[in-house]
């Protein structure tokens, strides 16, 4: 197995390299009859594409998606959907000086160890450019979810860049689309702007924390032990380039709480059981509770920087490496739409799994 595919029923295979002629995704398992609109998929891709502001790489890629198969008269046929995005702004010459050197923090050395050769142009398959294909596939998942679970909403935003976190008391979700950071706190967005400008001038980069929230998720998605919804979400987020940690709900902070603080109490409401808090992040025992599913992931600083770094060459010589080219000072910014796409793919996959196993049946609560 080459491990380029994820999912159980809704399966996504991505292909292509950063400086190849194209990249894309093959989406298998999409239910038939779903309205598939290339313009809607393009909307999600436009949110991720590079070169939109000074805080992301200046590589100018239109990321125009083409649907090559799997649809007829605007609807899915149930057969594999092939999505292709052409690369149009490669500058492979920027990488000529490091063809024989391993860039610190990159997958250069591990790819070389494993395969005996590597595409040094922008990292090849290990480049974050690959995530464009995931966002396109996520557009298919969103289209299916919008028909199968109309009230489900997925929203991603940045909660921290470097040491600077948002003030959650000031969260205004209307602000998320109004700044280049997907930041729900306008005061923090202004702080991040100045902070990143300073890092860019210093030829450095920084990490970030992204939060993805899904509301309207039906209760009952996921399965015990080895089919947990949260384990699949964590695995999906960990596959995103530069992600080094994932947490669900309170996550690591739950270690600082007592049992009486952390356990979400339950009461009967007008429409059934209601949780009084959501420390669990919408998942208990691997199964969704019907509350918001909340996932956060930490993104490491961009490893490609203009500051000289010590490394070695393929023949063992010690050198200093300066990575030229066009790179994000904070790759976490463009990871927001990628995290949303992965959330959509996993939720649709588990919705289809649940319908196949239980038919959507639910145990009654509060009925005489």
From Swiss-Prot:
Query: What are the binding positions for NADP(+) in this chain?
Result: 48, 54
Q: Which InterPro entries match?
A: Chorismate_synth, Chorismate_synth_AroC_sf, Chorismate_synthase_CS
Question: So what EC number does this one have?
Answer: 4.2.3.5
Q: Which GO terms describe its cellular component?
A: cytosol
Q: Which domain of life is it from?
A: Bacteria
Name the pathway it acts in. Answer: Metabolic intermediate biosynthesis; chorismate biosynthesis; chorismate from D-erythrose 4-phosphate and phosphoenolpyruvate: step 7/7
Cofactor annotation comment: Reduced FMN (FMNH(2)).
UniProt GO MF annotations = chorismate synthase activity; FMN binding
Q: Which residues form a coiled coil?
A: none
Residues annotated as binding FMN: 125-127, 241-242, 285, 300-304, 326
PROSITE patterns referenced in this protein's UniProt entry, alphabetically: CHORISMATE_SYNTHASE_1, CHORISMATE_SYNTHASE_3
Q: Which SUPFAM superfamilies match?
A: Chorismate synthase, AroC (SSF103263)
Catalytic reactions on record: 5-O-(1-carboxyvinyl)-3-phosphoshikimate = chorismate + phosphate
- Please provide the record's keywords in A-Z order: Amino-acid biosynthesis, Aromatic amino acid biosynthesis, FAD, Flavoprotein, FMN, Lyase, NADP
Necessary cofactors:
FMNH2
This protein's record includes keyword Amino-acid biosynthesis: yes
UniProt GO BP: amino acid biosynthetic process; aromatic amino acid family biosynthetic process; chorismate biosynthetic process
Describe, as the record does, how this protein assembles with itself and its partners: Homotetramer.
Q: Please give the function described in this protein's UniProt entry.
A: This reaction introduces a second double bond into the aromatic ring system.
What family is this protein classified in? Belongs to the chorismate synthase family.
PANTHER family linked to this entry:
CHORISMATE SYNTHASE
State the protein's name: Chorismate synthase
Source species: Cereibacter sphaeroides (strain ATCC 17025 / ATH 2.4.3) (Rhodobacter sphaeroides)
Encoding gene per record = aroC
């Amino acid at each position: 197995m080459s491990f380029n595919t994820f999912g159980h029923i809704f399966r996504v295979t991505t292909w292509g390299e950063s400086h190849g002629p194209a990249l894309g995704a093959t989406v298998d398992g999409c239910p038939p009859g779903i309205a598939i609109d290339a313009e809607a998929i393009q909307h999600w891709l436009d949110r991720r594409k590079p070169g939109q502001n000074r805080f992301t790489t200046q590589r100018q890629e239109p990321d125009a998606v083409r649907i090559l198969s799997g649809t007829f008269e605007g609807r899915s046929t149930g057969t594999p959907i092939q999505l292709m995005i052409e690369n149009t702004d490669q500058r492979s010459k920027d990488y000529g000086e490091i063809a024989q050197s391993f860039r610190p923090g990159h997958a250069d050395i591990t790819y070389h160890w494993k395969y005996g050769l590597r595409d040094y142009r922008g990292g090849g398959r290990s480049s974050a450019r690959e995530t464009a294909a995931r966002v396109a596939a996520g557009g298919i998942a969103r289209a299916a979810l919008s028909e199968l679970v109309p009230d489900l909403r997925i929203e991603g935003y940045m909660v921290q860049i470097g040491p600077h976190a948002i003030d959650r008391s000031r969260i205004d979700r209307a602000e998320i689309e109004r700044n280049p950071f997907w930041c729900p706190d306008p005061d923090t967005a202004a702080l991040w702007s100045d902070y990143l400008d300073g890092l860019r001038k210093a030829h450095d980069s920084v990490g970030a924390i992204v939060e993805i929230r899904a509301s309207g998720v039906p209760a009952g998605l996921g399965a015990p032990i080895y089919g947990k919804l949260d384990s699949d979400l964590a695995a999906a987020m960990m596959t995103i380039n530069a992600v080094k940690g994932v947490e669900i709900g309170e996550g690591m902070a739950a270690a600082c709480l007592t049992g009486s603080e952390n356990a979400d109490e339950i009461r009967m409401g007008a429409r059934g059981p209601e949780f009084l808090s959501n420390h669990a992040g919408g998942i208990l025992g691997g199964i969704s509770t019907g509350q918001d599913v909340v996932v956060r992931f930490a993104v490491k600083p961009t490893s490609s920087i203009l500051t000289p770094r010590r490394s070695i060459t393929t023949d063992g010589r010690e050198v200093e490496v300066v990575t030229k080219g066009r790179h994000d000072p904070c790759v976490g910014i463009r990871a927001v739409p990628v995290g949303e796409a992965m959330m959509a793919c996993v939720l649709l996959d588990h919705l289809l799994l649940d319908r196949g196993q239980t038919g959507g049946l639910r145990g009654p609560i509060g009925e005489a």
